[in-house]
Each structure stands twice: as structure tokens, then as C-alpha cells.
Amino acid sequence: MKVPISEARSRTGRPPISVRWVDVNKGDDMVPNYRSRLAARQMKALDSSGASYFAPAPPLEALRTVLSLAMTKCGNHQPDWDPLSPQRVQVSLVDVKRAYFNAKIDPEEPATFVKLPSEDPDAGKLCGRLLRHMYGTRPAADGWQEEYSTMLVGLGFRQGGASPNVFYHPVRKIATSVHGDDFTSERTKRCP
């Protein structure tokens, strides 16, 4: 939502956060597939004590937990190539597109203001107040974690105590690990 730059200064005591375009080639040299996204430049900022912020990332032990469950559920460590076999274990990898943009900003959180990109005709006069999280802002990872945790718990999953990014569905016997915007799930059709 576009607002006057003075609103950002009056509500936060700071100017809006600068933004930049990030271009990534999702293809290869032969068939390039460039994608661009606008990202905020807040992550490398320092807090009032001078300490730098960092984005939290869950440990890879969560992924190891899900894959270990997939290997040990039925006790058979031999591959089962029959797609209709009831002992077959399925491991699914899902990447959520634009994950942080799916997380709404809690109205109780302080507002986050960003500069408009130079291509916008209102750049320099107005700034943007975020209604959803944006890559590069400090609360983005926490907002996304809150969003997917609430959704999975609402679907009947139980959140792990030792590793809060591992979820288990006791009825469907599905284990899921979340690492940023990547979901890894395992499920056995039926164990003997």
C-alpha cells in the first residue's frame, strides 16, 4: 500500500527500507530462465546494540529425521520398485513458490515500510507499507513459519517438540520437515 514517506518516519523513526531487484537464472546456459524479484535490504542491518541480524534457518537434522523415518518404518531396507506395493515408501519434495509473500503481517506487529523501486512513477514521493512479508525483511522468516505451522496444525499435524519444523500426522502416518520454503514428506502405504 503506497503511503507518504513522512508516515514511515513518524511511525518508525526511520526512513523506508531500500529495495533492490534480484535476478536469478533458474535454467542453464543453453536454456536460460531468468526470474526477478524485489527484495528488501534490511537483513544486513544492525540492531540498536550494534549486533547484526540473521535469518533463522532450521537445522538439517529435521530433514534427516524424516528420511530416517522413511527408511526404518517397515524395517525393510531393500528398494521396492513396484509402485502398487503396500510397503512402498514415498518421499515427496515440495517447493513453495513466493513463500514469504504468502505470510500475512500480524496487525499487532510494527509496520514495515519500503522504498518504491525506481521504475515506479511515485518513487521518491511515496513509499510502500507492507501488507504481507517481503524477502529481506527481518520478520519474514518468522511470519512464514507462523503461517505454515498454523496451517499444518489445523490439518491435524502435531508439531515436534525438539524440532519445531518437523510435523507428524498421527492418523495418516505422514512426517513432514520444513526448511524455509521446502517441504519434505514421507509416508508408507502400509506397514506389516
Where are the model-predicted features located?
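Histidine-centered acyl-transfer/condensation active-site motif
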Residues: 173-187
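Chromodomain-type histone methyl-lysine reader module
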Residues: 1-150, 154-161, 166
